[in-house]
């Protein structure tokens, strides 16, 4: 501070974020006498710099000390692998990198595409707000949940049939959506995992110099799709219920099941009729019948 004032005539920074101590897994202060110190270079050699950085940021709540657990570093490494594998999958489906996130939005986006774009749009607003308040742990927890669950476990699985079918007219829309959401996610994640996000970004956005000088994602009202969000969340809930029933009854994934959806609501009927394909891939359904009553449903059917 004194050097900056002397040389530049101004303070080098106006805000300082102070974190607590990093203790060992028993809550003890690290010291030479206890021999419980952790060499960060050893952690980096084993798990990578991003994993260590991510662990230290996510585990350190303001006003509290944190305990260092190797299992948390391993979990951070696993998250980095998840991001890497998802990115690799996306690039494999557009090996020549012809489809860019900067291209004009496709006119034939599906409900699933609009759902993930809307979820990302909300995430951008929340994460930006959290980071402006220096709530780094809260922001990255939301990022983690979105990337791991919404993007990887749900959306990528939803679009796989479209990606594997060259005749599907919405294949390009799926790839555009995948890249658009991934790039925004990489930008939000970059302060936490700078190395892996830089590597992936420069491969997908090869026309840009670096993620470090790219623009921060901005909330966009045109990416709000409330109806599509509601529709896909309804489908997700149904898929979860089917999966839970199958797990409770120890039904093997290879064994397909006939699924009945009983509802008097025309809106709900339309939601399911427009999303029948998801149940084959996500819920191992052989067929889905949407009807207004229980007519024709076997008495031994499970609900």
Predicted regions and their residues:
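Hydrophobic "lid/gating" helix adjacent to the active-site nucleophile
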Residues: 3-4
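Feature 926 captures the class I aminoacyl-tRNA synthetase adenylation module centered on the KMSKS loop
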Residues: 7-39, 44-45, 49, 69-303
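Non-catalytic, structured segments within soluble enzyme domains
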Residues: 54-55, 59
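Transmembrane helix-loop junctions at the membrane interface of multipass transporters and ion channels
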Residues: 62-64
């Amino acid at each position: 501070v004194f050097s900056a004032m002397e040389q530049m005539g101004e303070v080098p920074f106006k805000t300082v974020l102070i974190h607590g101590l990093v203790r060992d897994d028993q809550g003890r202060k690290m010291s030479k006498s206890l021999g419980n110190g952790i060499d960060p270079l050893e952690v980096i050699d084993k798990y990578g710099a991003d994993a260590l950085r991510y662990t230290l940021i996510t585990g350190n709540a303001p006003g509290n000390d944190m305990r260092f657990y190797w299992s948390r570093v391993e979990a951070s490494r696993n998250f980095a692998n998840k991001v890497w594998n998802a990115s690799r999958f996306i690039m494999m489906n557009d090996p020549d990198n012809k489809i860019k996130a900067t291209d004009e939005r496709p006119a034939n986006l599906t409900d699933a595409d609009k759902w993930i774009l809307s979820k990302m749009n909300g995430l951008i607003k929340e994460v930006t707000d959290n980071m402006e308040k220096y709530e780094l742990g809260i922001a990255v927890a939301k990022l983690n949940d979105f990337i791991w669950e919404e993007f990887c476990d749900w959306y990528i699985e939803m679009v796989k049939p479209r990606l594997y079918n060259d005749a599907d007219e919405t294949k390009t829309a799926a790839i555009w959506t995948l890249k658009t959401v991934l790039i925004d996610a990489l930008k939000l994640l970059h302060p936490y995992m700078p190395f892996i996000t830089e590597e992936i970004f420069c491969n997908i956005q090869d026309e840009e110099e670096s993620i470090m000088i790219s623009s921060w994602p901005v909330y966009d009202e045109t990416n709000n799709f409330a109806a599509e969000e509601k529709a896909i969340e309804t489908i997700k809930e149904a898929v979860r219920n089917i999966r839970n029933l199958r797990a409770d009854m120890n039904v093997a994934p290879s064994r397909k099941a006939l699924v009945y959806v009983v509802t008097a609501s025309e809106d709900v009927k339309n939601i399911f009729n427009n999303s029948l394909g998801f149940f084959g891939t996500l819920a191992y359904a052989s067929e889905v019948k949407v009807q207004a009553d229980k007519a024709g449903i076997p008495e031994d059917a499970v609900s």
